[in-house]
């Protein structure tokens, strides 16, 4: 969320407060008032949550940290683990996920064997593309691979979300058959690990604005 929270009064180039991560808990049928996540997840610079595992123990975040030589203005993708009631300090994702290009959104499948992320690095189809790394049998991760056609276009693809069924991918794109700006699409992975042609979720989920 972008709002004054006492952590910092700094604003970005558009005059907005920096993003920070908040949480709310469901009590009975109501949600509690949002609270600022404690350190070390938030810093005085921009930090946003990208993905929280189903068991609530693993978090991917996008944050600005000038201690690392990544992305424009030091923005990269970081990971944190929950240890009891506390979170570990965010550590930058390795395996060539972060580069000097722009890496933004990220998500994982239910079993944490596939990580999808967004990058405008060289080797893509144009704009921002969806990329992935896979966990290998020896426990290490593969090199990043562009998801390619039919997922990526010459325009921007963003915000991947892997459904718990293990085969359905939701993402946003200004390409494909967008009816206006970034639309939400879905694609399914078949038994031969090929992605189906993305389907626009249509109105009223997507609009012309």
Model features per residue range: what roles?
Residues 1-209:
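Short, conserved micro-motifs composed of acidic
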């Amino acid at each position: 969320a972008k709002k004054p929270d006492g952590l910092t009064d700094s604003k970005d180039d558009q005059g907005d407060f920096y993003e920070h991560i908040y949480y709310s808990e469901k009590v009975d049928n109501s949600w509690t008032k949002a609270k600022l996540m404690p350190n070390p997840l938030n810093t005085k610079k921009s930090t946003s949550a990208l993905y929280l595992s189903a068991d609530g123990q693993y978090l991917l975040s996008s944050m600005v940290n000038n201690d690392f030589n990544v992305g424009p203005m030091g923005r990269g993708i970081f990971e944190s683990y929950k240890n009891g009631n506390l979170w570990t300090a965010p550590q930058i994702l390795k395996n060539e996920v972060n580069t000097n290009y722009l890496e933004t959104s990220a998500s994982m499948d239910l079993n944490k064997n596939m990580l999808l992320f967004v990058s405008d690095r060289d080797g893509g189809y144009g704009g921002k593309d969806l990329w992935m790394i896979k966990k290998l049998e020896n426990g290490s991760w593969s090199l990043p691979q562009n998801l390619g056609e039919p997922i990526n276009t010459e325009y921007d693809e963003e915000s991947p979300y892997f459904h718990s069924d293990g085969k359905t991918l939701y993402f946003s794109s200004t390409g494909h058959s967008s009816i206006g700006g970034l639309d939400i699409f879905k694609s399914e992975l078949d038994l031969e690990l090929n992605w189906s042609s993305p389907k626009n979720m249509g109105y009223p989920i997507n609009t012309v604005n």
